[in-house]
Curated annotation (Swiss-Prot):
It comes from Hyphomonas neptunium (strain ATCC 15444). The keyword Methyltransferase applies. Specifically methylates the pseudouridine at position 1915 (m3Psi1915) in 23S rRNA. It is found in: Cytoplasm. Homodimer. Belongs to the RNA methyltransferase RlmH family. This is Ribosomal RNA large subunit methyltransferase H. The lineage of its organism: Bacteria, Pseudomonadati, Pseudomonadota, Alphaproteobacteria, Hyphomonadales. One of its GO terms (molecular function) is rRNA (pseudouridine-N3-)-methyltransferase activity. Transmembrane segments: none annotated. Its main location: cytoplasm. It catalyses: pseudouridine(1915) in 23S rRNA + S-adenosyl-L-methionine = N(3)-methylpseudouridine(1915) in 23S rRNA + S-adenosyl-L-homocysteine + H(+). It comes from the Bacteria. It is an enzyme of class 2 (transferase).
Amino acid sequence: MRLQILAVGRLKDGPERDLTDDYIRRASAMARGLGFKGPEEAEIASGGGMDAEGARLLARIPEGARIIRLDEGGENLTSEAFASRLSRWRDDGERDTCFLIGGAEGYAPDVRAAAPQTLAFGVQTWPHRLVRAMLAEQLYRAMTILAGTPYHKA
């Protein structure tokens, strides 16, 4: 199952970019042996308003992909539950799973309709550049949980 992070806006060089890249690299190295590909990250151009950003986001989603929208009102999962869900989707034959990170204005109604499944990292609102790093870390953590390596200590 291919894992994709589709994020509105460009993550500039700096500690958040370094952290995100490090976790993506680490997750990718483990993913291959667990039946996953990626995670891959794609930056969607910001600007033009929520509807324009939404159209660009939707255009990048592979047909038939499972779409998970990152949202402060989304479902909160433990790391173990997140790993289990990824494993179940893989075992159910999902080809692509896309995690969406919206722009500063949020998600257009058509994106919300296309991606009713949501995920949150707590009830707080987080800066988008930190959400990318947090998602990349959770994907890496999920790979370590599924592989049984000692990174995750519950």
